[in-house]
């Protein structure tokens, strides 16, 4: 490791870069109802800003991953940071919802660069137990982001408005850009990929022909659909239907983030990843059905919140184990498999997000919960049994 880049420096910088996803998606959630009034549009159109950012986060991973392998880590990362700053300025000064939605797509692409390249830098700089330790610490920093981001947004929404939230994101982008200028190149020229772009795309096809990999990626994708249906609908349900303030909503959002994180930690208590994944999928299906009935009947908040906490906990059981199962199935193409896994999951989130804004939000959300949970469970049916995990 270069002497100019200490472990503490790398931990903070890479941790914040990997947290781009939650900051880009979660921080402005409490402002969605206010943005509906500001742009004089529907909730579904405002949620398109979430959709396009998810699509950008998905597509950008497929772009920045190969770019960083061919041209090094530093230049693509600096490019992503400049793009993030520019797209955030476009969000702030958007005069109509179409401009805002377009800017959010660019912001998602820029954020994906930080997510993908930060993992690559850690792999370049460290090896063995040091790499495992660094990735665990980065994961801890990243795990705090979904809790902190909506609280910051909810606390400041009433005082600075939605443009103020994006001004904070702009300042974060400037700080990270300054930090990236200090980052030394971690991939020397002699280690960079020399393969043609056609070979890279052919490796995507090879991975997609792996039935076991596809099964677990689909399972994760539909589980992400449940997650982003919740993310897109919760501001309107909690603030619009139940009458919560932006700050009260952010506290509930943070509590629900704990459900996902604690489930991921609890999943290691299962005997193998397959059991954790199957238990989580069955739990998702049961809680999704109960939550749909609750939303349809218009039950009280605590019934809604209790079932939602259970739904998110069940979903969290699948995340870590499904990732391990998918990556284990495509070990020979780990880089490609990782990029595609992230891209497909964010794509599912982007597709699902606007669906909860069609018609009655309560009924639409319940329907999306059931369909995604059912498809997540059915996806496991196409996965062939694997001897490494099939033991009781």
Predicted regions and their residues:
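Helix-breaking motifs and short loop linkers at transmembrane-helix boundaries and internal kinks
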Residues: 40, 72, 93-99, 110, ...
């Amino acid at each position: 490791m270069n002497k100019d880049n200490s472990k503490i420096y790398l931990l903070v910088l890479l941790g914040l870069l990997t947290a781009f996803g939650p900051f880009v998606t979660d921080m402005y959630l409490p402002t969605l109802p206010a943005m509906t009034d500001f742009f004089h549009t529907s909730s579904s159109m405002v949620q398109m800003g979430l959709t396009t950012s998810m699509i950008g986060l998905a597509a950008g991973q497929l772009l920045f991953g190969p770019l960083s392998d061919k041209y090094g880590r530093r230049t693509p990362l600096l490019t992503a940071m400049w793009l993030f700053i520019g797209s955030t300025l476009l969000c702030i000064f958007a005069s109509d919802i179409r401009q805002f939605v377009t800017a959010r797509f660019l912001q998602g692409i820029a954020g994906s660069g930080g997510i993908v390249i930060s993992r690559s830098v850690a792999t370049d700089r460290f090896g063995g137990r040091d790499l495992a330790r660094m990735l665990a610490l980065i994961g801890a920093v990243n795990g705090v982001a979904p809790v902190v981001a909506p609280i910051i947004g909810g606390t400041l929404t009433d005082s600075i408005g939605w443009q103020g939230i994006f001004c904070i994101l702009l300042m974060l982008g400037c700080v990270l850009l300054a930090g990236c200028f200090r980052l030394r190149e971690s991939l020397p020229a002699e280690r960079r990929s020399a393969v043609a772009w056609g070979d890279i795309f052919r490796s995507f096809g090879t991975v997609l022909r792996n039935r076991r990999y596809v099964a677990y990626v689909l399972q994760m994708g539909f589980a992400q659909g449940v997650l982003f249906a919740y993310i897109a609908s919760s501001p309107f349900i909690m603030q619009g239907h139940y009458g919560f303030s932006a700050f009260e909503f952010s506290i509930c959002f943070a509590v629900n983030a704990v459900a996902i994180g604690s489930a991921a930690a609890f999943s290691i208590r299962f005997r193998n990843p397959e059991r954790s994944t199957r238990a989580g999928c069955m739990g998702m299906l049961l809680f999704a059905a109960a939550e749909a009935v609750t939303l349809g009947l218009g039950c009280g908040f605590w019934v809604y919140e209790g079932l939602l906490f259970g739904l998110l906990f069940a979903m969290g059981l699948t995340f870590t184990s499904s990732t391990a199962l998918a990556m284990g199935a495509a070990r020979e193409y780990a880089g490609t498999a990782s990029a595609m896994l992230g891209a497909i999951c964010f794509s599912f989130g982007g597709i699902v997000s606007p669906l909860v804004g069609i018609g009655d939000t309560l009924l639409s959300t319940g329907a999306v919960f059931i369909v995604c949970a059912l498809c997540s469970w059915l996806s496991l049916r196409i996965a062939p049994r694997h001897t490494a995990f099939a033991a009781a």
